Amino acid sequence: NLTRVLIGEQVKHPDDDLSEADVLIEANVDDLDPRLWPGVLTSLIRAGAADAWLVPIIMKKGRPAHTVSVLARPDQAADLRYLLVTLTSTIGVRETSVRKTALPRGWVDLIIAGSCISIKIAHRHGTIWQVTPEFDDLERAAAEQDLSPITMLEQAMAAALAAGLVTGAPVPDGLRSST
């Protein structure tokens, strides 16, 4: 018999400060009325899921179905598992521990065509990596201004560019936090 012991220190990856432990909860569902899925996903998000999505699949015997996936913090997993079983026709779920890495983000509000639109800014080390107008704000503003969402998106991106909110630029002061 042999016992081997390794002594050392865990090496920290440079991006460990961006990672967090999460849980991925999934179920394959082949018999739910598809008109119910938008409400299921909305309910999961409102209940605290970090994200929820559907992927179409083909199950055994060629049956069309969906895999519903829910990303959540471990302390929310039990409630979200219960909600998934309650809102769908599934009789079981899978759960896997995962690590999620995400860039820090914040928001800046811009007034575009008389409407306030939040611009999401992903950043790292003081530099902007991505700029994205919040779509709910775009839809609301488009309706207020009687414009198409694509026109409002183009105006929002032009306003962000004019404000210097572009990839590679310094992160602006006064960025609203995601918390």
What are these regions (language model features)?
Residues 10-12, 22-24, 30-179:
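Long, contiguous binding/interaction regions
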Residues 17:
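Condensing-enzyme catalytic core mediating Claisen C-C bond formation in acyl metabolism
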